[in-house]
Amino acid sequence: MSDDAYGATIAKYRLARRLAELRRGTQHTANHVCDMLNWGRGKVGRFEANQWKRPEMSDIRDLLRIYDVGAAERDELEDLAVRARARPWWRDYADIFENEFPGFENDAVRIRVFMPLLLPGLLQTTDYFEAVMRHGSRPPAWRRRSLEARLRRQEILDRSDGSTPVLTAVITEASLMYRWGTKVDRREQVDHLVELSRRPNVELRIQRFADGPPVGMHSMVNIFDLPQGEQSLVYLETDYAIEEVSSTDSVNSYIQSFARASDSSLEPADTTAYLIQLAEQLE
């Protein structure tokens, strides 16, 4: 396991679902299991809802005993629990992240992101981020912590252990036209986008003014495709919160909307050419 705790969030997510399936297979209610183990009411429900930080191995073994799980499956689930117990870096940023967003982003095999007015966080330079934050109402200490977390998030694009996700980002021409910082700052941001667009795991697409209003999406959307066939998750961003969307119908709707937004945007090669031309204008 890499030092960014790759796989810990997915392991915890999968373990929660498997425990729920096992309990339902025994016909026990969650409260009945709590009573059998002398646990407080609600503990099993929290486990199954993935509302835990790190599963305790003794708790997992107690549940597997109650559910009469065979040796092979028990070993598999205990291995999941061990991986789920890894402490990821974002646990130190609970003041910045209120949910599992950074964990699923960290573990995703594919990330699709659409931002109508700003550049996605994974693509931002430090100067761009600081310029955006200066216009907000967050205190300086929070902004510094948020920048630290943003830089840690971006490290997933540089992993060399085979776990680097594929990133598809649809950005708008508007996000590139705002005046912020100095011309040098803006040039560095565009140069950074050019460099990213040339990576084999990054696909950038621009929605231009000339092509009409954005098609398909109008809010900040992140779609995380998870490993081993897990259902994709969607996170919606606002200035003050990141909301998870997990229902199958809603997730599928956002995936379809993203496809329309992507199809109405410049192809990746044309996007790179556009960005190079924009960088030249900022010389």
Question: Where is each model-derived feature located?
Answer:
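Interdomain hinge/linker segments and adjacent boundary elements that couple functional modules
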Residues: 2-7, 11-17, 21, 25, ...
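Short Asp/Glu-rich motifs
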Residues: 42, 83, 216
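C-terminal regulatory/effector modules of DNA-binding transcriptional regulators
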Residues: 182-283
